[in-house]
């Protein structure tokens, strides 16, 4: 039986005019081999759970496959606030679309496939370390429940790639509901290709926002949906302590899904000024700046949509960003604290918590996980996370008093056990700390991929106890704290 039997393919983007893309044949790597195949996810598309040579040959571009029509998308974007017209898929190719078991179509994108017309000064390759980081983080985010692109698998090779040192080329099979970015609309706006921009908007509505087609102003409704989805994504980032690192408009998905994992980082010590990108000298994309930058990016998108949407409608939609962000962030933080009843004083409780975390530089993830264990542990386990134990004790007393006000639908007081069981499904025990990723990369570069596979499995269930992996909850060693990652990939 064919491995493709029962898998449905299409390629709607390839039906658009030539202004949208260029067809490109993947440039083969030497001795390509599987590093990891995401079998559990693959089965959701009708693909086999285990990797094999047929899958390798087709996805690596070594064998022609009728449903695939590899193409490089053209787009533009604002990078660190400066418009760059010369962007596009410089090392990745959109192969086709594949239908999920729930009926949703997902793009299949091969990253590291070689030169394209948009490679600029690059070589079109992706190195092993950056490919491992993107694979692990996209799957870690999915495990956490944060909107994200996914990864179907990754491969390494014997092809040398020259960066600061000689490395080896790798391939990532990225899967996403769309690869359309803010920068697609910007490209057509700034090149005055307004008919193409209108066509793009029509297709985005048809493919991704069909409900907007019934609206009085479909394009305005589309933009409002993009604003809302972006606000929700940012709320997740801030609640879970994720720093993206390179929030250029060409890295912003129209569906509010975390896109293009480069110099990302999860908070270790709580530091709102955390900068994970080694190249971000001004801190433009620092952790606490992410909501502001998302709104800036949406404003740039709004400007590019001005031929399609009236100014007052664009401004009205932008005005809803902070409202939706605040609503979603509050909802997520309440869940993390086990507080489902709204009380006016909660804002002060939240503020005091963040101030305490910041002043003591306590570990963000461990703090919330310990709060989730107060049904089986003493409050001292939380207090001991802080240098200023007196202040921590005072806050914990306030928090526990607040928990006493929680009641269920029947008006009954919520027990600590019930509260904490829910919190443990919201506050992860495991996250992809940068030092863990680096250890896996170091081993992989020596030919040992066991740690990559171990992390990939562990991070699928970040909320579960998995006691055999307790070592992965350790705080980072000195060398692994607040790691700044290079954009070099």
From Swiss-Prot:
Binding site for Mg(2+): 251, 260
Any Pfam family matching the protein: SelO
One of the record's GO molecular function terms: ATP binding
The protein's required cofactors: Mg(2+); Mn(2+)
Secretion signal, residue range per the UniProt entry: none
Record-listed E.C. numbers: 2.7.7.-, 2.7.7.108
Keywords: ATP-binding, Magnesium, Manganese, Metal-binding, Nucleotide-binding, Nucleotidyltransferase, Transferase
Keyword Magnesium: yes
Residues binding ATP: 88, 90-91, 111, 123-124, 174, 181, 260
Catalysed reactions, semicolon-separated: L-seryl-[protein] + ATP = 3-O-(5'-adenylyl)-L-seryl-[protein] + diphosphate; L-threonyl-[protein] + ATP = 3-O-(5'-adenylyl)-L-threonyl-[protein] + diphosphate; L-tyrosyl-[protein] + ATP = O-(5'-adenylyl)-L-tyrosyl-[protein] + diphosphate; L-histidyl-[protein] + UTP = N(tele)-(5'-uridylyl)-L-histidyl-[protein] + diphosphate
Tagged with keyword Metal-binding: yes
Active site: 250
Family: Belongs to the SELO family.
Functional note: Nucleotidyltransferase involved in the post-translational modification of proteins. It can catalyze the addition of adenosine monophosphate (AMP) or uridine monophosphate (UMP) to a protein, resulting in modifications known as AMPylation and UMPylation.
Record-given protein name: Protein nucleotidyltransferase YdiU
Native source species: Vibrio campbellii (strain ATCC BAA-1116)
């Amino acid at each position: 039986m064919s491995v493709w039997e029962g898998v449905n393919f299409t390629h709607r983007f390839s039906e658009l005019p030539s202004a949208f893309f260029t067809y490109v044949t993947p440039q083969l790597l030497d001795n390509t081999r599987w590093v990891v195949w995401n079998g559990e996810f693959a089965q959701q598309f009708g693909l086999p759970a285990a990797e094999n040579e047929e899958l390798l040959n087709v996805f690596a571009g070594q064998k022609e496959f009728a449903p695939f029509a590899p193409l490089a998308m053209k787009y533009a974007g604002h990078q660190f606030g400066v418009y760059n017209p010369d962007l596009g898929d410089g090392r990745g190719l959109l192969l086709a679309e594949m239908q999920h078991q729930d009926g949703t179509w997902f793009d299949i994108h091969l990253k590291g496939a070689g030169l394209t017309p948009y490679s600029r000064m690059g070589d079109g390759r992706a190195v092993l370390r950056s490919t491992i980081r993107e694979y692990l983080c996209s799957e870690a985010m999915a495990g956490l429940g944060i909107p994200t692109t996914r990864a179907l698998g990754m491969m390494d090779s014997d092809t040398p790639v020259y960066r600061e040192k000689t490395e080896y080329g790798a391939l990532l099979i990225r899967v996403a509901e769309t690869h359309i970015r803010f920068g697609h609309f910007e490209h057509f706006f700034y090149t005055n290709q307004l008919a193409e921009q209108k066509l793009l908007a029509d297709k985005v509505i048809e493919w991704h926002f069909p409900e907007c087609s019934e609206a009085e102003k479909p394009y305005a409704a589309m933009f409002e949906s993009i604003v809302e989805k972006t606000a929700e994504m940012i709320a997740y980032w801030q609640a879970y302590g994720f720093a993206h690192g390179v929030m250029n408009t060409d890295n912003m998905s129209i569906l509010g899904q975390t896109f293009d994992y480069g110099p990302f980082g999860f908070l270790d010590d709580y530091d709102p000024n955390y900068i994970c990108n080694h190249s971000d000298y001004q801190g433009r994309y620092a952790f606490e700046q992410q909501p502001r930058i998302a709104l800036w990016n949406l404003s740039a998108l709004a400007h590019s949509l001005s031929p399609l949407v009236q100014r007052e409608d664009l401004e009205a939609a932008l005005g809803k960003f902070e409202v939706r962000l605040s609503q979603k962030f509050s909802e997520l933080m309440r869940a993390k604290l086990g507080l489902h009843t709204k009380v006016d004083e909660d804002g002060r409780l939240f503020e005091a918590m963040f101030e305490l975390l910041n002043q003591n530089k306590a570990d963000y993830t461990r703090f919330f996980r310990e709060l989730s264990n107060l049904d089986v542990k003493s409050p001292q386990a939380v207090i001991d996370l802080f240098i200023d134990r007196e202040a921590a004790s005072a806050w914990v007393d306030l928090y526990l008093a607040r928990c006493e006000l929680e009641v269920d639908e029947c008006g009954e007081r919520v027990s600590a056990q019930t509260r904490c069981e829910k919190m443990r499904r919201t506050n992860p025990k495991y996250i992809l700390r940068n030092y863990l990723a680096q250890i896996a990369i170091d081993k992989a570069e020596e030919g040992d991929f066991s740690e990559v596979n171990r992390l990939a499995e562990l991070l699928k269930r970040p909320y579960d106890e998995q006691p055999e992996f307790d070592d992965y909850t350790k705080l980072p060693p000195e060398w692994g704290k607040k790691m700044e990652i290079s954009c070099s990939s």
